[in-house]
Amino acid sequence: TGAILKEIVNLVGSDRVRINYDTANAIFYGDVDVVQDLGACMDRVGYIHLKDKAGGRKEWDFPALGKGYVPFPELFAMLDKAENHSPFSIEIEFTAAGPKDLAEVNQAVLDSARYLKEHGFVL
């Protein structure tokens, strides 16, 4: 969870060590409300791993951005308010079976890029 990661980073005691926050893993592994969880560690976040989550909490289902239930607009607003300009990466893991083919991967990347552009990001 963000609180645990913040505790670890604080124990290191270096401004060069930051949290790489993974939005969907916080739900899948941490069973937390991602908005509250990110808020708990925002001041120590240095990188954001954007990954959406669909299906049940422990179901391996990570679709294109905007196709799951991670509240990205709320997270983006929190980051803006905190003046946290950490870089992002996008991860799309699909389901446990993986993508059907390269066309599905390409479409998921396009959908994710479109989603970010719709929310004001320049790619």
Predicted segments, located by residue:
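Histidine-acidic metal/acid-base catalytic patches
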Residues: G2-Y21, I27-L123
